[in-house]
């Protein structure tokens, strides 16, 4: 990026010089004329360890110092956003403070919530997960303290000079010496934007980055700027995007050996006691080694590195044998990681992320299980639930949406799942390891990743179990980082060929369709003009027909002209133009038409859509605030609502959800629909608005049903009373962490109840009792059936015993061989054949009731029952399989049964003779 981007009046007036680092070659600005290095690791080592560069601050003190400083300088303080980025459809977790305002504020679609503003935003980045605890500086969750200004041609807030001046002044306000600060030039790009930036360095540590975002990928009439080989174009907005690392500032203010000692002093001490490592804290050698190790490890890149080689370099640098270094630091690294991970989990679960196998839930489970593994390695006394609760209390439990008790239940549920995974995982890995060992090949990394993604089996367990089976597995030191990186961004669903694509160009040339279904949602008749007609698609100037969208099917109905009538089968939206797929005859441009919407279907869809909102609210009331919509599909007869929940919904909870929903219906609460500016709606209602996805645009349409408010484009009833009864027909566990509620509303619910009543009456009639007596009668019948089943089994055993007395067979080389056709059930065939094999013999039995069933058993090592059954069934036109001692099969050709059994007998005799 051009030098003039960084040649600031402030740098000139304050006596800065621009230099080039002798180590990395990057340009930087400094007040020190003798400085030769940029001041960033690895060009220099950390020199603040044991030598703090700021006045001592804990986390709360440093956060308040920053926010109040910028408030004094005209910035509005904002409350933090959730760590679950529910206002974004491209990422799952909040990764930076600027992510709070992407994409709509940064693109200029909506105004910022304040301008200028300051915020301390908890962020989660898992791309360096394996470095946490090892490097002394990496965290999964960190607070990015920031001040942002959004400059437009009409309103200039401030730009580069004032941003750097504010940075200098803030550093001075917390006891730092601005003369020790270097500003390193570093062009920034990401998320489709770019700009000049400077890294703020002091004591060898980067404590902040000041980004001046003024470029975007969107092509404009301005000449492009090359950033890392990619053309970017000047934006209308010039955005000050700063990020100050709260934890790094605290670390530099304390000069502790690691960032973990500075940020989590009480938690680290607690974990050391829990792991029975507290004696190390009083060991001078330990303190020395940890301090030196942190100082030197800090200048090395942990990610993707061979960890042993890195430790060897650190050991050489501090003159300690590498084995001794590992014995000391590995348990402590796990303590540090647990301290970090439990705080990360406190935010994840406290902000209502539900652990699962998908989306942000996958990432929460990844961190949670990694924490459990390390706690198991250290045989810790503390429970994970207690540690996460302690971290929530440090932050302030009132700052989380989810309550502590629910978080504890979620964690306990996950611990039980993890234990179950470990129990069954060993068997799965053993089978795979034996397979690769037999092929004399290593277990590939792809297999290890699949085992983790599909079964939740940790790589450490894979390596351990595989080694016991004689198979080799190599796990990269950054395994968890690789896994997290592949799951951190939302994957765009693969889209097949859209049949509407052929019409896009034509639709763009047409005026927007007036949406009468919003203005007059309860009307079913309207008049309009045909603007275009092609391929059975009619475009009107206005319409009452609702197009498919948001999980709601389209309206259907008719269009009538003076000469003809056509049927509207489907309605779709293409941009701002609505297309009606019609059958029954062509329409002409300019035709006046009368549209008639199928009233019963329209009302049923409206009832079901509003009922979806009601049911979601009821589920949150019963199950907890963590419940979020994972999907929905409305129908005119039956609808479904998928919700995120950490365990199966019980029958009692299902009844309570249904009752809660119907109470809201009976309250006959008005349904309020408004079009609101996005920023104001988010501030008023929170990000629970986006249950059904994130709509584009400056304004969003909000639908309020009781206490539930969502951004929604669907059609709705006027009051909850118009929904009519809501009947939950069932619940399905469709995937880990997602439950599906199947329901009906209005007349459809009445039909569903009537159908269930009919089934009940039919069942009662079948046993000649009144419906109210059916449960007791069924219980009695079931009890009698169980007794009769026992008696049948007793008699069957007696039959088998009697049959056995008549199955003499023949003896071949001392082995009893019985080959016979029997009039017996399949179960009886197996029982008889097994009895022969248990006595060391060989049996081949068949029965025929149209299809021939074949069973073979072998108690002789030279006779393989599978081979016999496959060949016999092959003659019968079928196939079979099983194990060497018991095999089963079938074939349709009963006419060749005698031939097949004779062939089988001969094969058995040959095997016994060793032929």
Curated annotation (Swiss-Prot):
| Recorded superkingdom | Archaea
**UniProt-listed Pfam families:** DHHA1, tRNA-synt_2c, tRNA_SAD
Q: Which CDD domains match?
A: AlaRS_core
The record's cofactor note says: Binds 1 zinc ion per subunit.
Which cofactors is this protein said to need? Zn(2+)
Gene Ontology molecular functions: alanine-tRNA ligase activity; aminoacyl-tRNA deacylase activity; ATP binding; tRNA binding; zinc ion binding
Q: What reactions does this protein catalyze?
A: tRNA(Ala) + L-alanine + ATP = L-alanyl-tRNA(Ala) + AMP + diphosphate
The question of whether ATP-binding is a record keyword is answered with yes
Question: Could you say which EC number(s) this protein's record lists?
Answer: 6.1.1.7
Keywords per UniProt: Aminoacyl-tRNA synthetase, ATP-binding, Cytoplasm, Ligase, Metal-binding, Nucleotide-binding, Protein biosynthesis, RNA-binding, tRNA-binding, Zinc
According to its UniProt record, where is this protein mainly located?
Answer: cytoplasm
Q: Which GO terms describe its biological process?
A: alanyl-tRNA aminoacylation
Q: Where in the cell is it found?
A: Cytoplasm
GO cellular component terms listed in the entry, alphabetical order: cytoplasm
Residues binding Zn(2+): 609, 613, 712, 716
- InterPro entries linked to this entry: aa-tRNA-synth_II/BPL/LPL, Ala-tRNA-lgiase_IIc, Ala-tRNA-ligase_IIc_anticod-bd, Ala-tRNA-synth_IIc_core, Ala-tRNA-synth_IIc_N, Ala-tRNA_lgiase_arc, Ala-tRNA_ligase, DHHA1_dom
What exactly does this protein do?
Catalyzes the attachment of alanine to tRNA(Ala) in a two-step reaction: alanine is first activated by ATP to form Ala-AMP and then transferred to the acceptor end of tRNA(Ala). Also edits incorrectly charged Ser-tRNA(Ala) and Gly-tRNA(Ala) via its editing domain.
Q: Which family does it belong to?
A: Belongs to the class-II aminoacyl-tRNA synthetase family.
Q: What is known of its domains?
A: Consists of three domains; the N-terminal catalytic domain, the editing domain and the C-terminal C-Ala domain. The editing domain removes incorrectly charged amino acids, while the C-Ala domain, along with tRNA(Ala), serves as a bridge to cooperatively bring together the editing and aminoacylation centers thus stimulating deacylation of misacylated tRNAs.
- The protein depicted here goes by the name Alanine--tRNA ligase
